[in-house]
Amino acid sequence: VSVSKLKVGLKCGGSDGLSGITANPLVGSFSDKLISMGGTTVLTEVPEMFGAETILMNRCRTEKLFNKTVDLINNFKEYFLKYGEKTDENPSPGNKAGGITTIADKSLGCVQKGGSAVVEDVLSYAEPVKKKGLSLLQAPGNDLVASNALAASGCQLVLFTTGRGTPFGCPVPTAKLSSNT
């Protein structure tokens, strides 16, 4: 089977101050390489993108995709506000203990997993992947919910970066890349 058939979900959890500058860029390089060979990667964890979303917006292939990305981010922020959640309470206590100080730190690490590829599609939660290349998927940062969304969208593998470690697994093979140096 050709590598061009591969659909890989990109996820992180238990991030620390170094995983965003070590493991996440490594996954981004993998994503770029897979896409150059005709494969597909899917980036999720929308709240983790807050603060770095313009990096992804500027990589959208079309104005329509740009607008869908804006809506993806804004709809999540509106959801948080509707239910009294603060959009700036990220990073988590574990992230902070590991050295991430702001949502900007965490967001810049999150978007690194998408490499430098053009955004080809924006998907609703669990919507099947339709296009080759990099897609953005609506899902929260929660490991269980986001990874299951990736699996439901058709990803056959999830690359999961972590600095602090996690026992998490999901319905599709989950390769953990742990880095804290």
What label would you give each PLM region?
Residues 1:
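Active-site cavity-forming subdomains of large catalytic enzyme subunits
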Residues 5, 10-12, 16-181:
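Anaerobic metallocofactor- and corrinoid-dependent redox/one-carbon enzyme cores
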